[in-house]
């Protein structure tokens, strides 16, 4: 008993000693708060990079982009500039800013990517912000958003190809934004290079002074070191005041599994730090900032983003819903809403090409939905609507800016999410003007009015037209005019901007343009033509819905609104192609292409034949006729009640190009 009491006394004294030690020794208390990161606000710049950036005033900021036609060397030039400023190590062509698999495979830029650079010019540090923009017409929304965060642009032209259609289009976009343009002639090291011709084209087409142009080779690095001093001297510094309330523009967004939605922002006024609470003008939702930083070239955390800078932020707790990140939205700090005027934002791009997407396996629909939602977060110009088909099940109707945009989205869906999908051929919207004066835009061919409704209730049908600008060598002029005329085009203008190069303008139906017009144009000109287009309004048109019928039952997944001149050709093509992919049945299958009740093409698949005469004697004619009649009646009954089973792979093969 005595031993037990001694043990208790020893334990009691030990506890008292530990309590006195705890009270006398003050350990720092670590506060965990999921909403705010208070410690980040008071953090001083520690890295050499942060110290250098903190010492640079807004007068020594430069935000610029590179404007060019597809494949004129934008991404390669970006690499050389990043190497020159020490942002990345010198080496082979890395295409640092082309981060998507599809960009590296196709050699094109799809997403506008950004990077900050530090450059010492005449003993002073400058903070340069470079945007690598897409060149293709389909990604014009990306281009126009990029221009909003820039003060100037390098207008890049290939010395061997000269000015192309998208050079012209992107020049006018940049000019409309008021950007200061620096002419640059690239690929001067090629044997086929003709810099003098390219300079003359710039002078005649854009009225730019050839003396201000810089002749470079992005591949070899020739004269690239002259570009950044030219940018510093000619491109104006961004305007902003870091002492004013925060005014922050959302330029782009992408999704991270761990951080939620990450925003690319341009700071116009004020500054933002981790721990600040900001509010969206578009949604009214409030968020605590988890981290701010710059792209250098990857995400590099910073203490603060100041007026004039472009960088990224993400929130803590994270922004989980991609729909909350509205591109063109303005953010400010909570409490400053009445002091800040929201920025005008961006014009929403209109989808002009529509496809339907279905999973090959119906059970994959939730996975497909999740995959599409993640991709649309990074690409705001895609419109999304659920739809259902009797033949293919549940799916989505997707709207795109153009055919390349559609093709790239499909590639990204397959590569980045492994989704096995069926994509229908691209279609365009049509306008229905009813007799009561109402107007309706129809994007789904299945919802296009039937022939009886058209005659009774519809006053007029219209289809969209575009003004296409085509540039190509003069020797192919006859072939290109013939191609445009066969696609219902109307010539608007023809000019020679050099002795060998032609600019041809045609008004074309958008439906013809999405039907592989660019591929046919490349074929007619041996790949030397370039194409750009802009909307040209709606026109009255003789259009109708072409349907595919199997045993007189319409297949809803295969219907298309076409011009009267295309009905016969497309109808015959459909029935012959669909016949190849449908398996024989025990009864005859009739495949028809029809406009309303008018059948324009027909094919039939003969049934399997059982030899009912096998056991008969050759001379038993009466019995022979009786068995054949019986077999014929049986087939009629089977055809009347039997359903044609068409597998998904048949649709997949039929809808593939």
UniProtKB/Swiss-Prot annotation:
It is an enzyme of class 3 (hydrolase). It is found in: Mitochondrion inner membrane. It comes from Blastomyces gilchristii (strain SLH14081). GTP binds at residues 68-75, 132-136, 186-189. Its main location: mitochondrion. This is Translation factor GUF1, mitochondrial. Promotes mitochondrial protein synthesis. May act as a fidelity factor of the translation reaction, by catalyzing a one-codon backward translocation of tRNAs on improperly translocated ribosomes. Binds to mitochondrial ribosomes in a GTP-dependent manner. Residues 1-39 form a transit peptide. One of its GO terms (biological process) is positive regulation of translation. It catalyses: GTP + H2O = GDP + phosphate + H(+). It comes from the Eukaryota. NCBIfam families: lepA, small_GTP.
């Amino acid at each position: 008993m005595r031993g037990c009491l001694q043990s208790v006394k020893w334990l009691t004294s030990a506890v008292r000693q530990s309590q006195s030690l705890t009270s006398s020794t003050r350990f720092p208390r670590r506060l965990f708060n999921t909403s705010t990161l208070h410690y980040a606000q008071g953090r001083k710049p520690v890295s050499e990079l942060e110290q250098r950036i903190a010492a640079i005033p807004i007068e020594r900021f430069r935000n610029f982009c590179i404007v060019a036609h597809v494949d004129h060397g934008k991404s390669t030039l970006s690499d050389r500039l990043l190497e020159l400023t020490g942002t990345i190590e010198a080496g082979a062509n890395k295409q640092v800013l082309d981060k998507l698999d599809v960009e590296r495979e196709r050699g094109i830029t799809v997403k506008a990517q950004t990077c900050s650079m530090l450059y010492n010019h005449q003993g002073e540090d400058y903070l340069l912000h470079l945007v690598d923009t897409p060149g293709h017409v389909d990604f014009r929304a990306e281009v126009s958003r990029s221009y909003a965060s820039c003060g100037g642009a390098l207008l890049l032209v290939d010395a061997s190809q000269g000015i192309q259609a998208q050079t012209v289009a992107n020049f006018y976009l940049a000019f409309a934004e008021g950007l200061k343009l620096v002419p640059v002639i690239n690929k001067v090291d090629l044997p086929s290079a003709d810099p003098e011709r390219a300079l003359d084209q710039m002078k005649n087409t854009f009225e730019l002074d050839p003396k201000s142009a810089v002749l470079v080779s992005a591949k070899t690095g020739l004269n690239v070191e002259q570009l950044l001093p030219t940018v510093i001297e000619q491109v104006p510094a961004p305007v902003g005041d870091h002492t004013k309330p925060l005014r922050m523009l959302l330029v782009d967004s992408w999704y991270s599994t761990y951080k939620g939605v990450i925003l690319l922002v341009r700071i116009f006024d004020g500054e933002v730090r981790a721990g600040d609470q900001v509010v969206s003008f578009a949604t009214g939702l409030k968020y605590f900032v988890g981290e701010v930083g710059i792209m250098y070239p990857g995400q590099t955390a910073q203490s603060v983003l100041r007026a004039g800078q472009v960088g990224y932020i993400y929130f803590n707790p994270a922004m989980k819903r991609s729909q909350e990140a509205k591109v063109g939205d303005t953010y400010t700090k909570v409490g400053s809403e009445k002091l800040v005027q929201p920025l005008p934002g961006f014009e929403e791009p209109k989808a002009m090409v529509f496809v339907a997407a279905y999973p090959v396996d119906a059970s994959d629909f939730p996975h497909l939905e999740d995959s599409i939602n993640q991709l649309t977060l990074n690409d705001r110009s895609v419109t999304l609507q659920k739809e259902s088909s009797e033949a293919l099940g549940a799916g989505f109707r997707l709207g795109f800016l153009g055919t390349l945009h559609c093709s790239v989205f499909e590639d990204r869906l397959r590569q980045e999410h492994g989704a096995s999908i069926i994509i229908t051929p691209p279609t365009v919207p049509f306008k229905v003007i009813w007799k009561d004066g109402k107007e309706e835009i129809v994007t789904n061919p299945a919802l296009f009015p039937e022939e009886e409704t058209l005659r009774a209730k519809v006053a007029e049908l219209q289809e969209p037209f575009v003004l296409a600008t085509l540039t190509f060598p003069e020797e192919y002029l006859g072939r290109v005019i013939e191609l445009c005329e066969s696609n219902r085009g109307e010539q608007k203008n023809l000019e020679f901007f050099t002795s060998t190069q032609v600019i041809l303008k045609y008004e074309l139906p958008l439906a013809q343009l999405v039907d592989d017009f660019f591929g046919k144009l490349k074929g007619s000109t041996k790949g030397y033509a370039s194409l750009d287009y802009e909307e040209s309004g709606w026109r009255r048109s003789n259009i109708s819905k072409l349907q595919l019928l199997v045993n007189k039952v319409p297949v809803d997944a295969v219907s298309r609104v076409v011009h009267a001149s295309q009905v016969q050709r497309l109808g015959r093509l459909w029935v012959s192609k669909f016949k190849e992919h449908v398996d024989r049945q025990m009864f005859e299958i009739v495949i028809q292409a029809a406009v309303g009740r008018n059948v324009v093409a027909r094919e039939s698949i003969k049934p399997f034949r059982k030899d009912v005469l096998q056991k008969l004697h050759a001379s038993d004619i009466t019995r022979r006729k009786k068995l054949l009649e019986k077999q014929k009646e049986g087939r009629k009954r089977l055809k009347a009640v039997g359903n044609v089973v068409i597998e998904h792979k048949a649709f997949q093969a039929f809808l593939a190009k």
